Structures are given as structure tokens and as C-alpha cells.
Amino acid sequence: LAALASAPALAAGRAWQPAGFVALGDWGRRGDPVQSAVARGLAAGAREVASRFVIAAGDNFYPGGVASIRDPHWKDSFEAVYVDPGLQTPWYAALGNHDYRGAPQAQVAYTGHSRRWRMPGRYYKASGAVCGVPDLDLFVIDTSPLVDDLNLDERVQQLCRGHWWQAEAEPEIAWLRDALARSRAPWKIVVGHHPIYSGAHGDSPVLIARVAPLLEAFGVQAYIHGHDHDLQHIRRGSVDYICSGAGSQGGRVRAIPGTRFCLGQPGFAAFRLRPEVLQLQLRGAAGEVLYSAALPRTR
């Protein structure tokens, strides 16, 4: 934790160029009307913020993931839906619980067969040099092995496919701690499928105990997730928790302690990163801005 004594300085000697990106979760429904509508709004939002990449926050393929890299789901839910030129950028994807009902490794493998799909592992880091935003490090984690021992349905789904969450969780937590400790980026964002704090499915005690302290300790500014089929902005401590899980469906949501905004309708999140502020917009299916907030780099 000694590395946290002072925040890293912003890259010097160059003019800052505002960097945009967009995020959506819970989206892959073979191009159904709601998914397609949100895809059009996402494209408009991506153009407006000059998006450099897309965050896909899990549950990428409903209802049971993909079976292989040749599964028709890839075309029906991804390649043939997000066709706008503004979305032909890297997609940094996380795994969700529905993805584990198929072959999650196929989503990792698809990275080698796609010009834009990025999932080099179940959890990984995309540095600023990789994602095209020099002052940002992006950390994508796989939350299902961390939380699904508390959910009987998901536990059975995973056990039937040989996923032993206890064995998979410890190395991931150790990796996240080490990766955050090593990061010198002024901006750090962590992406996972499941919420840590939630006004829909409810808080995750495991993630509160094991992930939230790492976010606080290592100066992470934001945690972006899906799972809840809604749009939320919650601030707890020094971290902003942003739900963008409404890529193909809306759902019920309520305000909880720390809630700045919540709405249970389809949509997505758009961001514009500046040296000291991350501008957040939660947008509806048509791309309209429903809520905006300026998230400071230091709290």
C-alpha cells in the first residue's frame, strides 16, 4: 500500500486529448428489438463522445453463452447488430453468469478470430498504451467464480461444467491486488459483471469484502458492471459504482445509500475522460442523456 502515498502524475510533455468510451452489459439477445434499439443509440453515443473502445460488462450471450467460436450467436448477437462504424473499435469484454452456461473459454478464444473482440483471459488488464488512452489502466475481472457459490442455480450451472469457484477465486484476487499495486496510471477503472453495491439484485457481500477494499486502497476511481438490468450511479467512499446492465432489457431498481441516480429502462453509459474529471452520461435506448455527472480523479 506504500505505493499509494501519492497519486501518479498525469503524463507530461504532451497536449491532453479528451478520450471517450461507452459501456453496456447484458446485451446479447440475437438482435431482438430492444437490443437493436440500444445498439443504434450506442452508436450515436459513441460518435458523440468520439469513443475509442467499448466496455462489454458481461452476459454477452443470452440465455446460455456460446458453445464455440463458430456459434451462430456471434453473428446474430454481435457482428450483425453492432455494425455502425462508430462501434468498430476494440470491445473489452467481461464474462457474466449467463456466459458460464456455455463455454466461457470460447469467448476468450474468439479474441484471436475478431478484429474488435478483446478478451485475452477470464481476467486481464488493458493498459493505456493498449486501449489508446495513455492515462488510463482498465482492469477486467471475472466475478462469477467469486460470487456464484452463494447462488444455487449458478453454482449448479458452473459445477456441471467443471468450474470450481473456490480454486479459481484466490488466484484472481491475488492477480487484481498485484495488478492494481503495479499500476502507475492516474486513472484506474475496474470492470466486472456483478455489482458490488446494487439497488436491484442487492449488494454482494463477497465483493464488498474482497474487491471493494482493493478499489479503495489502490485509488480506483470507478467500477463498471452489469447484471442489474438498469442504469445506476452509486458513490460509496472514494469509488463511483456505475451500472450499465440495460443493453437489451430494463428492470426494477430502487435507490439505496449512496445512490445518485437509478432508472430501470434500456440504455447504456457513455464517458469522456479529461485530466481531472471523468464525465459520465447514462443514456436511454435512443441515445438521449438521462443523467450526467462529473467524477473527479481525486476524492
Residue spans of the language-model regions?
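Membrane-interface helix/loop caps of multi-pass membrane proteins
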Residues: 51, 57, 95-97, 136, ...
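N-terminal active-site segment of His-dependent metallophosphoesterases
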Residues: 10-73, 171, 178, 198-199
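Short acidic, glycine-rich surface-loop motifs adjacent to enzyme active sites
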Residues: 183-199
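Active-site flanking residues adjacent to catalytic metal/cofactor-binding acidic residues
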Residues: 25-26, 58-59, 141, 192, ...
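A short C-terminal boundary segment appended to hydrolase-like catalytic domains
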Residues: 260-261, 266-299
